[in-house]
């Protein structure tokens, strides 16, 4: 007679299938199977959430257990962040470098025009420097010629003045006129020149020229100053005596 277990189920025969090693009976639920089914359901939910996040935002969600993108079978260093970004497109630095290269690259016509422009400017600078040197040399030469002409003109003027002086002192009354013309000399004054001229006239006087010599010493230019004395009558008397001297 088969023995009954404490739960009322008949115990198996020796060597037969065991009923208590995790295999559920016909009417009972296995706890281990239920736990495994629950874990599989949670894992499937997590995978579905990641798939929806990729479709919505375009970026993969965090990997479970710290696994890198691409799964545990991905090679180390191949699926890192930077390389993974380059697999989808160029990085920001690469895009900036390529943009600078495109900006720096210019058409052949523009490059040729720039070279011709530089050559033309260099030629203009060289021509300007050459003209400046020529102008300086020409200016120095003209200045030297001007100084030579001035010196020549000065020598001619001195020679003409000597000739004029010799001709002047050969004429009559040259000494008297010379005294009068030299009144601005610091050694002579107007009174001294007039006195010397009067003495010379007395020494060489001739009868009937006294009033003429007196009139020569007078200033007959009218004065317009109010403070000057009225000598118009005296002036008229001297002029009349000069023109018609008294007969002794």
Curated annotation (Swiss-Prot):
Residues 61-71 have a biased composition (Pro residues). The modification Phosphoserine is found at residues 105, 206, 236. It is found in: Cytoplasmic vesicle membrane; Membrane, Coated pit; Cytoplasm, Cytoskeleton, Spindle. It comes from the Eukaryota. Residues 13-25 have a biased composition (Gly residues). The modification N6-acetyllysine is found at residues 223, 242. GO terms for cellular component: clathrin coat; clathrin coat of coated pit; clathrin coat of trans-Golgi network vesicle; clathrin complex; clathrin vesicle coat; clathrin-coated endocytic vesicle; cytoplasmic vesicle; cytosol. GO terms for molecular function: clathrin heavy chain binding; GTPase binding; peptide binding; protein-containing complex binding; structural molecule activity. Belongs to the clathrin light chain family. This is Clathrin light chain A.
């Amino acid at each position: 007679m088969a023995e009954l277990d404490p739960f009322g189920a008949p115990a198996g025969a020796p060597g037969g299938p065991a009923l208590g090693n995790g295999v559920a009976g016909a009417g009972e639920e296995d706890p281990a199977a239920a736990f495994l089914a629950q874990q599989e359901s949670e894992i499937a939910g997590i995978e579905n959430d990641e798939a929806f996040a990729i479709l919505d935002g375009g970026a993969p969600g965090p990997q479970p257990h710290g696994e890198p993108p691409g799964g545990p079978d991905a090679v180390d260093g191949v699926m890192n962040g930077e390389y993974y970004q380059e697999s989808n497109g160029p990085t920001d630095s690469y895009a900036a470098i390529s943009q600078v290269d495109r900006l720096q690259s210019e058409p052949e016509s523009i490059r040729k025009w720039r070279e011709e422009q530089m050559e033309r400017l260099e030629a203009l600078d060289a021509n300007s420097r050459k003209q400046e040197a020529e102008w300086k040399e020409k200016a120095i030469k003209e200045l030297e010629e001007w100084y030579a002409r001035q010196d020549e003109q000065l020598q001619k003027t001195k020679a003409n003045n000597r000739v004029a002086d010799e001709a002047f002192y050969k004429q009559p009354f040259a000494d008297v006129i010379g005294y009068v013309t030299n009144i601005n000399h610091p050694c002579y004054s107007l009174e001294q020149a007039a006195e010397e001229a009067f003495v010379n006239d007395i020494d060489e006087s001739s009868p009937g020229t006294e009033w003429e010599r007196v009139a020569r010493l007078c200033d007959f230019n009218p004065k317009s100053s109010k403070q000057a004395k009225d000598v118009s009558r005296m002036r008229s008397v001297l002029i009349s005596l000069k023109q018609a001297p008294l007969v002794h």
